[in-house]
Amino acid sequence: MTVTSQVKPEDEMLNWGRLILDGVSYSDMVGARDRPKEITWFDYWMSLANEYEQEAERKVALGHDLSAGELLMSAALCAQYAQFLWFDERRQKGQARKVELYQKAAPLLSPPAERHELVVDGIPMPVYVRIPEGPGPHPAVIMLGGLESTKEESFQMENLVLDRGMATATFDGPGQGEMFEYKRIAGDYEKYTSAVVDLLTKLEAIRNDAIGVLGRSLGGNYALKSAACEPRLAACISWGGFSDLDYWDLETPLTKESWKYVSKVDTLEEARLHVHAALETRDVLSQIACPTYILHGVHDEVPLSFVDTVLELVPAEHLNLVVEKDGDHCCHNLGIRPRLEMADWLYDVLVAGKKVAPTMKGWPLNG
């Protein structure tokens, strides 16, 4: 028997902490919650994106480019969160609008985001690089999105890293954002991370010996595999990630539909088989040779067995494990503290060059 969720998508998957920490204003969230019944979730956010864009155009006319960039960034986030819950034409419409708005925002941001047009195996892969102020060369952090999150969503985390003297690079890989049209979710994401490393090592503003990777949610899975397979990476953060999808049965109905969508298959069983194979990392985790920070919330949908896997397979001398007893998925419910701690850890490793000692915080749970 097929069980269909009766919960609205915005109630099933919406995490207020995530959206607010990523830059969506509390007032906009309240507006979405309290919107008139005749206005859909999608239409509310797309209309709001238009309003932010219009205000940005007014700011440009007045010579206030910095404010315009912030407003366009807000517009892009509105388009992102309009579409990320759907698997029909709304997804494509919102995605295209988000890309358009972010392209407008990019040169107006502080620091600006420069778009580099890469091609990997014949597939176009735009990469945005932001360089911090001050003399270089600078360390850099490659940021990886998740199941429905894309490069534009990392803006606030980028800013924390940039403020600490590190450059950032963002892109969409297989099954994500701009690349989804060309390639479904696949088991070779590390190839695309390595292509970004190739790009960064050619930039005079970047320190070749201090490039790290940070991945959120599914991106945390990608970060672990990238660190295992790309020896040029000097640091790795898996932020609410996982090592495998053995826990498929624990996923929500909407998350399973999302896996099906990015797999470009017709049935949930086909999706399960595809992503289970594509996202397996346990065979390579022992190859990780750089400092690795893993953040996991006890109340995450990803089971605590992930922690056992990490402790068994990731070399102990490289591991910094943080388990938050009150944390949800990616610990979005804990405010900015976990993000600051990750940014500071990256600073210690990549900027200050500290030899971070292996640590375990919050584990074992009753320890």
Swiss-Prot record:
Reaction catalysis annotation: 2,6-dihydroxypseudooxynicotine + H2O = 2,6-dihydroxypyridine + 4-(methylamino)butanoate + H(+)
Any one GO molecular function term: hydrolase activity
Activity at various pH: Optimum pH is 7.5.
Effect of substituting H329A: 92% loss of activity
E.C. number(s) listed in UniProt: 3.7.1.19
InterPro entries: AB_hydrolase_fold (IPR029058), FrsA-like (IPR010520), FrsA_esterase (IPR050261)
Active-site residues from the entry: E148, S217, D300, H329
Main EC class the enzyme belongs to: hydrolase
GO biological process, one term: nicotine catabolic process
Superkingdom of origin organism: Bacteria
Pathway where this protein functions: Alkaloid degradation; nicotine degradation; 2,6-dihydroxypyridine and 4-(methylamino)butanoate from 6-hydroxypseudooxynicotine: step 2/2
Record bears the keyword Signal: no
Keywords: Alkaloid metabolism, Hydrolase, Plasmid
Subunit structure comment from the entry: Homodimer.
Record function comment: L-nicotine is used as a growth substrate. Plays a role in nicotine catabolism by cleaving a C-C bond in 2,6-dihydroxypseudooxynicotine.
PANTHER family: CONIDIAL PIGMENT BIOSYNTHESIS PROTEIN AYG1 (AFU_ORTHOLOGUE AFUA_2G17550), DIENELACTONE HYDROLASE DOMAIN-CONTAINING PROTEIN-RELATED
Similarity comment text for this entry: Belongs to the AB hydrolase superfamily.
Full protein name: 2,6-dihydropseudooxynicotine hydrolase
Species name: Paenarthrobacter nicotinovorans (Arthrobacter nicotinovorans)
Taxon lineage: Bacteria, Bacillati, Actinomycetota, Actinomycetes, Micrococcales
